[in-house]
């Protein structure tokens, strides 16, 4: 948008945020532990509510004098939170190594370690989500760990889009009043739920008023009159929204941020997402613009303050989880554009202001997404392309033509499907009515193929980890191999679903979420917590990892072993067992003589589709513990690196322990040799119902491509092709290999360099060496 600029306020706040060191924080853990101890006899949901209220009343709050949007999750910026309710055992094991571990490091205070072990750890032993699950089902989960990663074992679920519109219209006071009215008429079994909502909304109101009081105290000592008046306005916003629905754009943005801070305090989970925020805030923006109390430059500055706040919260995982979710992805996903409930193209000034904010700041959060469809305006599309060209890894793009009809197959109403949003990385959701459990588990199809080839033996350790349905030497035909592979998928899927059910049960028992539930459709109506199935929709998503390697491997076996007989079954199996040492010629054939996924070759593309379809169709026959459907996704976050470490050599020529293909729908890097359009055509052969939980296609372009208006136009047309081919998702890195190598060598000089990892953006210099190398190795395109 012409004439808009980044203010000095924003530059100063950004510099200050990025310069502060990260620490692990036990502040909330101490408050929660004490509150639990004082309320041992309460029902769990009341205990949880009182604990959140105590944290809202007692945790240290801080305000920078220049801030237009206030509210902090921790006393310091980008602190990692110790959350003992979900997991304390791993913290105890890893506290000392947090500053030195390979990925996602945090500084620690020695006195915090001592306090944790003296005060916090003893109380939570055997009571945390992590410990309870380990007692109930840990052995069974560990048995399948080389093939399946079960998630949410030591942290709350998250991955949900609350009803922001309801929150803005009611605020904590309105929801408190609603809970009080429900308490007068509810059934006995619903009382604890409504009482818990009442408690947390009282806490939310108090939290907001605390900021009002602090800022007013600060304003009294402020000598700059302009700044003083701004501070008073910010303070009044906090007080106003604690008492009534929001009335102005500034209040609406402030209220939105408080919602997400409190959600984080309640659950300490990733991927709470605002959804279609340009639409949520539109009425307040238009009103203020019309009345002359706001202009576009002022609105942009408020938005950029919100963007900075999104970057102040990071998520601290255990070292194992940090490999799978590297770079602190917290998943505040905001979607702009797309269709309205009637199928019309929709965008507004805020859509462009959000893009402008991303262009100015280039930060990893929020995870900005653009919904595209056949009727998307050229104006919005080309502006989004110009932001892509800036190289921050955003925005990513979603395809209404693929998404809307596919998620309706899950029982989602058309009006809700048209209003879909994204949570976390690429996970599809409806807004304000869906607990999607979109990160339930990851299923390593390549490891399942490995044990089908070896008779259940792990190539890396030699141990038996699966049933023996035969091995490659015993399969006289390719069909026999396929039959054994199906049996291995079935075996691990059954085990996985039993584990997922146990995880859901434990969340219901231990981590009810009354604050979140108040903003989810049907929960307040039915007096049921969202974790227990109170939402309108109750899905569970499983990720298939990774069809590119799988398709390439199966085609290699079929062609070289069974069709052309270039090698025997024993030779191929021995080559895998020996990591191709002594079998270099065979590996060269696997790599160079066999067609590869990503080049628009039906034979290999359809092999990937065939197995993804099998997995999806079988999975869809099951229901989760909340009686909702299971469905599939195809995205890896950064799991393609650690999951690759668990897989031996594969028939596509990949060496043992090397990363699998990134993304989820992306080709193996270096094998997509026919250009980006061929990649699109390959991916389009994957049925769109395979990715109702989200699909991910990564591409990397050189910055030079975007230097001219012709390049911008060509790229916009490329995205139109993406829409026509009904591919659900696409995202881009725009960066030179030389810059990435320089950043590895001199990280301090490239502190602000962000890259697209897999569905999210992270600072390149904060990624572990293995993941940096994988990103550098991805195919780069200079033209379309």
Give the positions of each predicted feature.
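Conserved catalytic cores of very large enzyme subunits
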Residues: 1-195, 227-233, 237, 241-784
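Extended non-globular scaffold/tether segments
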Residues: 195-206
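Extended, non-transmembrane alpha-helical coiled-coils
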Residues: 206, 210-213, 217
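Extended, structured, electrostatic nucleic-acid-contact surfaces
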Residues: 216, 220, 285
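Acidic, metal/cofactor-coordinating or nucleic-acid-engaging core segments within structured domains
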Residues: 224
